[in-house]
Amino acid sequence: MTLEPVAIETDVLVIGAGAAGMYAAIEASRGGARVFLVDRSLIGRGGATVMAQMTVAAALGEEVPDSPRHHYNDTIAAGRGLCDETLAQLLCEDAPACIRELDAWGVGWARKDNHITATTAPGHDRARCVYVDFINTGPAVSKTLRTVMAGNKDIRKAGDICIIDLVAGSDGEIAGAVGWHVGSGAPVTVAAKATVLATGGLTRLYRRNSASLNMGGDGYALALRAGASLIDMEFVQFFPIGHLAPRLVGMDPIMWDPFRYKLGGRLLNGRMEEFTSRYGSDEDGKYVLPRDLATYAIFKEVEAGRGSPHGGAYLSFEHCSAAALRAAFGPVIDRLAANAIDLTGMPVEVAPIAHYHMGGVVADAQMRTELPGLFAAGEVVGGTSGANRLSSNAITEAVVFGRRAGRSAAVHAKTIARKDLRAASVRAALDLVGAGNCGAPDLNTAALIARLQAIMADEVGPFRTAAKLDRALAGIAVLADELGERPPRFAGGTDAGFDLQRLEWFDLRNMLVVARAVAQSALARTESRGAHQREDFSQMLPDWRRHQRVRLAGGVLQVSGAPAEALAS
C-alpha cells in the first residue's frame, strides 16, 4: 500500500529546529505568522546548539568597557579579510539584545554582583563571552527556546520530517517544500508563503566531528538544487583540541577549550615538549594561537612524527593543583573521574576535529537569499565569519540571524497570497519519496557514508594539495555512481516504518553534492587563508581576497570567484 501524502499549509515554514530555527519560529509568530517548524530529529534536541557547552559572544559591557564595534573588530580580524562586513556588523550589534532577551526568558546566564558575567576566549580582546556554565550553555539555550515555544498556538512543530527538496510556485518564488516522515514513510508537502532554512552546517562529512548526525549539509544541498548560490564553501573550521583519548562518554569533545585558556593548560607533543612557539605563538604555556594556527601546529607535529600515540597532541594540567582544578572545572571534575581521567596525574590526548563551516547560502541583511520567498539563518548562512570564525560567535550567529530571519519571513508572508506548489516539481519529489523504480535493495549506505567521511578527512582536511583534492573529487564521483539516482525500497514494503538505509540514502544525496562543493572550491582557491591551507600554495595572496560562489547548473557544480564587495545586497 502506498501512503497518501500529508499536505500542510502555513504562512512560514522553518526547516531545522536548532537555536536558529526555534528563534526564527518564535520571532515569526510574534510577527503574526502561523509557523510550521520541522526537523529531521526531535524538535530542539538535534543540531549543534544543544551540544555546545561553552560560551556565547556579546558585547554587553557590564563588567569591562565594551561595544559592538570592538566585537566587530575582533570578528573581522579572525576572518582574514573575507568577512561580509554587513553581516558581521549586524551580528555584533544585535547580539546584546538577544542575550538579554534570553536572560529575560530564564536561560540562567552566570551572574556576578547582580549582572551577567563574561569570560575571555581566544581572539577576543576583552571578556565578552557569556555562559550558563562551561558544560551546559548550549543545552540551556535550547531548553529555553523550547520552553518559550511550548503552548504557542501559532507554532506547529513536527519532528522526524526529512525535507528532500524546496519547491517553487508558478512564478518561480519558493512556495514550500516536499519531504517524508522517517517513522512512517508518509510523504509530506508543505505550502508556505515564506520558508526559512535553519539546517546548520556540514561537519558530518568528516570522520571526527563535534556536532550531531543532523549536520550533513542538508540546507546547502536544498538551496543549490533550488537555484541559490553558496559562498566560501572551502572554509571548514577544525577545532584544534577536540578530545581524542582516553575514552570520554557523555561530554562534548571540545569541552577542553575554556579550561585550557583559563588554566594555561600545556599543549605537548608525543615527546612531552611544548611546541606552539614553532608556529607563531609567542608563549607556549598559554593558549594564544587562533584556532586555524593551533590546528596547523598540531597537524605539523603529527606529520613530523612527534604526535601522541593516537595521532594528536597531549593537553596537560599536571602543573595545576587539585584545588585549582576543582575551582576551575567544578562538577566537570567528577564527570571526568567517572571516565577514569585524573588531570592531576595524567594528560589527555587531543586532536583537531571538524567543528564549524564558515561558508553557506548567500543572504542579505534581512536574511533573504537570492530566491524570493527563501530566507536563511544560523550556520547555513555563508560569509559572516570569512575564512575563520571567531570563537564563541556560533550560538551568537544562531540567535541573531534566527531572530532576523523569522522577522523578515513574517513580513514577507503578510505581503503575498499563498502560491500553489509547482505540480511537476511536487510530482518529481513525491516520486522520489515513493516506492516506484527503487534503487538497489542491498546498497550498504552506512559503508558509503564511512567512505565519504574517510575521503574528506584524508584529502579535504585543513591542509590540502591539488593531488589530494583531485583524489577526493574522483572518490566522491565513484560514491555518487554507487549511490544511484533512486533510494532503496522500504524494507518489507512501501510503508513499513522507519528504515535507516533509506534515510541514509537521502543523507548521502545531500552529503555528496556538498562534499563536491567543498572540494571544488578548495581546489580553485590557490592560496592559503584562514581555515583553508594549501600546502602547494602556502601564501595568503591579496588577489584572493574574494569570495567564491558555487551554483548547480544542469546537475553540474560551477565555482566562480567574486570580489569581496560584490556579495548579494
Language-model features: locations:
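Glycine- and aromatic-enriched mobile tails/lids
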Residues: M1-L3, I8, A19, G31, ...
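N-terminal Rossmann-like FAD-binding beta1-loop-alpha1 element of flavoenzymes
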Residues: V12-L37
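Dinucleotide-binding Rossmann-like beta1-alpha1 core, especially the glycine-rich loop
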Residues: D74-E101
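Conserved N-terminal glycine-rich FAD pyrophosphate-binding loop of Rossmann-like flavoproteins
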Residues: S41-D74, R80, Q237-I241, G250-D252
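Glycine-/small-residue-rich beta->alpha transition segments that form the dinucleotide
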Residues: A192-A194, A198-T203, V380-V381
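Core beta-strand elements of the Rossmann-like FAD/NAD(P) dinucleotide-binding domain
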Residues: A7-T10, G185-A194, E370
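Conserved redox-cofactor binding core of oxidoreductases
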Residues: R45, C98-A186, A198, G242-P246
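An anion/pyrophosphate-binding glycine-rich loop and adjacent beta-alpha core
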Residues: L222, A228-I341, V399, S408-T415, ...
